[in-house]
Amino acid sequence: ILAAGVCNAFLAGDLFNLFVSFEMLLAASFVLLTVGGSADRIRAGVSYVMVSMVSSVIFLLGIAYAYFATGTLNLADMAIKLQDLPSGTTTTLFAVLLVAFGIKAAVFPLSTWLPDSYPTAPAPVTAVFAGLLTKVGVYAIIRAHTLMFPGGALDDVLMIAGLLTMIVGILGAIAQTDIKRLLSFTLVSHIGYMIFGIALSTPLGLSSTIYYVVHHILVQTTLFLVVGLIERQAGAASLRRLGGLAAASPVLAILFFLPALNLGGIPPFSGFV
């Protein structure tokens, strides 16, 4: 169901099918988050569902407003009809959709759910979530920004949101002692890079964002998978208890070190490019 929801989101040609995709992702994510039935996982799953339901309600309001204003939900048709509407109407519609998609993408200040939810799930589930779930939200923002609202009315807002997401995410990561929570905050920070690229409203900015999305899917997924191996080897994900792990398991250390360098943008890795 999760894979079908992701595929449908990337292939959707109208807002309603995109909404259905988001709901498929929500249902599958809740099951995967709460697998095992521990109190922490159930709490994280309920928190994630409540935040996602708020996003769904806002998205539904945006869909209703879009249909009322244009008479269609097809993205290509809307792109044409929105050109004839007053700027206030299009800006309001874009703002509503941005809030809905921003929650899915974990854009600050709508990102607080992510660091609380991801670390509680099993490592393979967290890896899939890190690689795909937030990227669906970023993709939805790209579709809305480039196809329906190319005028750049809210570019300044997007740019500020991107900058704040970068800063808050990395400051949150610095304060963590659990490596899974550290990576979760780092994930939020890197979402900010993607949003900033979209806000530039240039072909170079958009192509850079798409490249960075692909890079981040590969690197962040790898890191969460390796952290799962580290947790299994050491019995904990706390940095305080992982001292000497490199000497005890040099292969794991290398497996973590290489994608970490990549994520940090160290040349010649793809994160630097």
Task: Give the label of every model feature segment.
Residues 1-16, 29-273:
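Hydrophobic transmembrane alpha-helices and their helix-loop junctions in integral membrane proteins
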Residues 23:
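Short phosphate-coordinating micro-motif centered on Lys-Gly-acidic
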